[in-house]
Amino acid sequence: MQKSTSKYVIDPISIKTNCSSEESYIRCVEYGKGKAHYRNLILLAKAILAGVFVGVCAHASGIAGGLFYYHKLREYVGISMSAFVYGFTFPIAFLCIICTGSDLFTGNTLAVTTALLQKKLGLLCYMRVMCISLVGNYIGAVAFAFFVSYGSGAFSINTDTSKNHIFQFLNDIAIKKVSHSFIECICLAIGCNIFVCLAVYFVLSIKDGSGLVFSVFFAVYAFAIAGYEHIIANIYTLNLALMISNDISFTQVYFKNLLPTLIGNYIAGGLVLAFPLFFIYRSCYYDYDKMNDELNTVVLKTLSLELQNESNHI
């Protein structure tokens, strides 16, 4: 059997700490294609787990940011210190998702869309994966918000102003999120998911562990501190705000924020990133796919000859 010399071979064991741009795209398509092989219940479980991780770290970020939202400190530094701490804590969610192989809808908008564009999965299969990941993320985030964040009373309102800063921080974030216009929210969501999808791309491109952690951390930190809109994080934050506050309504949460955020996140991954990458590197993937087909044909022929020789000996 001849060894392939194609430059598009995905080599998991290499002295290189990062992939070439062509190999990164190939890995992205293969990653998206691989999601279609899971059964519905497995996909749902992976998506619920990702939603829980977002909830866990959004809870921790809310507490950390709230501690710096103390009213006397806020008089001097405003929200800047709380935003810094919030953004510094939240990226842990994405590291948890990556390490456990959980399924996040926003990352799928890039990976699964590239697999669709390369015709490695059909439209119905694409919609199945995307819908299950979104529903699972929603279940995980809302369940954590209700059973842990709301159930523990960590964000409950306190009549004592000196002890109400954690509730006030979450409440102010929620009010700000539902104050955007529909178009503003879409634009902020596009900015957010560009960073999130790039974080996924970094994971597929960088082989060095510490480099991977730093690249993912700063990509997610950038969107968190910039005030961008992330659909799964917002599902947790705004549903928790609905549970503990009367300052926002169901209509504001779902139609003024979550709907435009969903649209903007999808535009970022599925259009802004997936289409240009497909246009630039599609021929690289075709070469890789063709090479794999030829290799599989050689393997099958070799196995056929070996079986034929064995039968002749018998």
From Swiss-Prot:
Residues 69-77, 150-185, 233-260 are extracellular. Inhibited by the Malaria Box compound MMV007839 and its derivatives BH296 and BH267.meta. Gene3D superfamilies: Glycerol uptake facilitator protein (1.20.1080.10). The chain crosses the membrane at residues 48-68, 78-98, 129-149, 186-206, 212-232, 261-281. Keywords: Cell membrane, Membrane, Transmembrane, Transmembrane helix, Transport, Vacuole. This is Formate-nitrite transporter. The keyword Chloroplast does not apply. It is found in: Cell membrane; Vacuole membrane. One of its GO terms (biological process) is nitrite transport. Belongs to the FNT transporter (TC 1.A.16) family. Coiled coil: none annotated. Monocarboxylate-proton symporter that mediates the efflux of the waste product lactate in the intraerythrocytic parasites; active in acidic-to-neutral pH range. Transports L-lactate. InterPro entries: Aquaporin-like, For/NO2_transpt, For/NO2_transpt_CS. It catalyses: (S)-lactate(in) + H(+)(in) = (S)-lactate(out) + H(+)(out); formate(in) + H(+)(in) = formate(out) + H(+)(out); pyruvate(out) + H(+)(out) = pyruvate(in) + H(+)(in); acetate(out) + H(+)(out) = acetate(in) + H(+)(in). It holds the Pfam family Form_Nir_trans. The keyword Nucleus does not apply. It is a multi-pass membrane protein. Homopentamer. Residues 1-47, 99-128, 207-211, 282-314 are cytoplasmic. GO terms for cellular component: plasma membrane; vacuolar membrane. One of its GO terms (molecular function) is high-affinity secondary active nitrite transmembrane transporter activity.
